[in-house]
Amino acid sequence: MSEKAPFMVFSGTNSRYLAEKICASLDCPLGNMNITHFADGEFAVSYEESIRGAHVFLVQSTFPNSDNLMELLLMIDAAKRASAKSVVAVIPYFGWARQDRKDKPRVSIGAKLVADLLSVAGIDRLITMDLHADQIQGFFNIPVDHLYASAVFLPYIQSLQLENLVIATPDVGGSKRASTFSKYLGVPLVLCNKSREKANEVASMQIIGDVEGKIVVLIDDIVDTAGTITKAANIMLEAGAQSVRAIASHCVMSDPASFRVQESALTEMVFTDSIPYAKKCPKVKQLSIADMFAETIKRVMNNESISSQYII
């Protein structure tokens, strides 16, 4: 991208709080946009200032999924029609990412469909974080900058100065992510093997590794109903763990997640602010990713390496 053209940052309804933090880090104003809602449930998007010839960055997580995704698509379309030089979708939480493959007959691949919708709407680049499946990047024919929340989580874990620490994953599918944490910190890795009878319900779980007398930090990407993460915490405490805390990138927290976290063995549940969390749960803490996304926008504009800012 050319350095001569200006860049502008705009936000959808869902991520304005994060966009404001990103703009504060960039020392630039948040662009003016009007989103009009109609009685029939439709809405319309208009830019309240000229974006002709500008590199436009649109900040919007797609959760709750449908309305925020549609809002983002309209933002992209309006920007292209207003002669923006380029349009970059900044999607901290990429909804539909758990629908990344056909795991049974006659089902859609939602992540691929969303990728197609964004591409057809006209984005030139995607900036996102901790996709549920890395291969989703291959659904796009444009550059995808895939950031990792480890850049904020690892310094936080180190600041706690925990002794007898082990890193754990609540399911085998997250072992690669947890393994990178354990290797970076130089501590053991513990796995949980779970089985489900149906979506959002964990039938059974077994621990693979030793947690007796250990301080456990569970690593995950998404916490939805919190059934898996809280069950893992409770089982580890029963197995002799000294304490259990959890860290996850995306705070979906569908009901009854807040209740489950509060009533569980977890001492704290730490997320990024990729998704706003308005419910009250004293155990929940959010770390901001605004500086990381601001730095990425700077590097995109300056044609600098993105991957060099990753910790892992």
Stretches with model-predicted labels:
Residues 1-312:
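PRPP-associated nucleotide enzymes
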